[in-house]
């Protein structure tokens, strides 16, 4: 009771003096100080949530002004600056955090944590895919939507649907990106397969066309290759021992400096989010028609996100930690708002690292090891909307999916989410792989693009939530291992003390030189002499 009074100064004063009239101003002052302290601690969260609400209201108010495309571009400029700052910091943040994280863990811990992370990512993504397929068959989003036309949904500015790609070429691209031929080029380009059609004239007069795959470099950071290189480099520096300590300290310092830059950028997030959301609402032509036409598809996707993010993932976290998952998630409101506004897991990575370490107390070695990997390979939200989209397009074309095709959707969606681009609309590109795998046309992807700006927001939130809860689980398991090791070490020390004394007391030399007399001091003196 005395200690609790000492930690709160205003409580000590209140207990020492009777609750009379003169103490009332100090009590009011104490409340105002507590309120001010609360707002200071949660200022960034409150400002970020306010930015989302103000941005939505601003967009709704400006829709009636019929802004031109140029004016909308100017309106979105502050949000564009936020995206540029976040993307600027991704490369040093990912590389330095993974190198320092991998170098700070020993080989056994790295293998154990890596194995748990891979199992967690794989199982949660597979469960998300199964949930999405079940919801799609129950809700039937494609039933009665065969007459939809993408031109009537305001899709003129969304661009053409992605080119269909063979499944084997998609996985070959994944392997190519894992091992980039040039690390500098990997910082701003990624490998992708394109196709050229070659016409052959046979001797019989027939004309045949052959589609030849051609590997090209497209714009976009090869985050998968950089992640693998950083992990291997961190392990190699750890193996070097003293020779690698200088370089490890360099990456640690670089990482800390990067986190300082992140803390500065975070104060611009509320402004950028406000203009990002406002400009996107102004840009859409007819939101009511869009939602009513594809409402069942949007509902099925978002319901899957709510169930997986609000029930499945928290239950997994509770099963491992026996802690309240929503208390853990409450400290991550700023990253969730950033994910909702930017639609990018990679752009959310800086704020996620900062908040999960400062607000939730996750070990830096854990967060900086697992979060960059999760932002690259863990896409639970993307797997949900990809499976719903695949079943939606099948129902749109009156195709009854058999058990083999459903299994193909589950496996392909889970595998395709690994290495999917952590950028806005990145998941749409992988839907073409699923459709090709089950033999469905890809021309209906334009309908998915029409509402992707809505679904992609909850998709990104679920993606980063899965990464955060995975980091929390790994942190809890690592703490258990550390505590168990400390307990075993204490037991060894406790057992060692009486054993050493008993050996000294029963030493033949001590017994011989001190046949009689007090035995409390003599053993210690003899032992000191023998050591000297």
From Swiss-Prot:
Give TM regions. 42-62, 88-108, 119-139, 217-237, 257-277, 298-318, 328-348, 373-393, 418-438
Residue ranges in the Cytoplasmic topological domain are 1-41
Positions carrying N-acetylmethionine: 1
Give me any GO biological process, just one: L-serine import across plasma membrane
Q: Which residues form a coiled coil?
A: none
User: Phosphoserine: which positions carry it?
Assistant: 507, 527, 530
* Membrane topology category: Multi-pass membrane protein
Q: Name one Pfam family in it.
A: SDF
Localisation per UniProt entry: Membrane; Melanosome
Glycosylated residues: list them.
201, 206
Q: Which InterPro entries match?
A: DAACS, Na-dicarboxylate_symporter, Na-dicarboxylate_symporter_CS, Na:dicarbo_symporter_sf
Keywords attached to this Swiss-Prot or TrEMBL record, sorted alphabetically, are: Acetylation, Glycoprotein, Membrane, Phosphoprotein, Symport, Transmembrane, Transmembrane helix, Transport
Q: Which residues lie on this side of the membrane: Extracellular?
A: 140-216
Q: Where is this region: Disordered?
A: 1-29, 495-532
Q: Which reaction does it catalyse?
A: L-threonine(in) + Na(+)(in) = L-threonine(out) + Na(+)(out); L-serine(in) + Na(+)(in) = L-serine(out) + Na(+)(out); L-cysteine(in) + Na(+)(in) = L-cysteine(out) + Na(+)(out); L-alanine(in) + Na(+)(in) = L-alanine(out) + Na(+)(out)
Entry's Gene Ontology cellular component terms: centrosome; dendrite; intermediate filament; melanosome; neuronal cell body; plasma membrane
Q: Read off the PANTHER family from this record.
A: NEUTRAL AMINO ACID TRANSPORTER A (PTHR11958:SF20), SODIUM/DICARBOXYLATE SYMPORTER-RELATED (PTHR11958)
Q: Which family does it belong to?
A: Belongs to the dicarboxylate/amino acid:cation symporter (DAACS) (TC 2.A.23) family. SLC1A4 subfamily.
- Give the protein's biological function: Sodium-dependent neutral amino-acid transporter that mediates transport of alanine, serine, cysteine, proline, hydroxyproline and threonine.
Name of the protein in its database record = Neutral amino acid transporter A
Task: Give the species.
Answer: Mus musculus (Mouse)
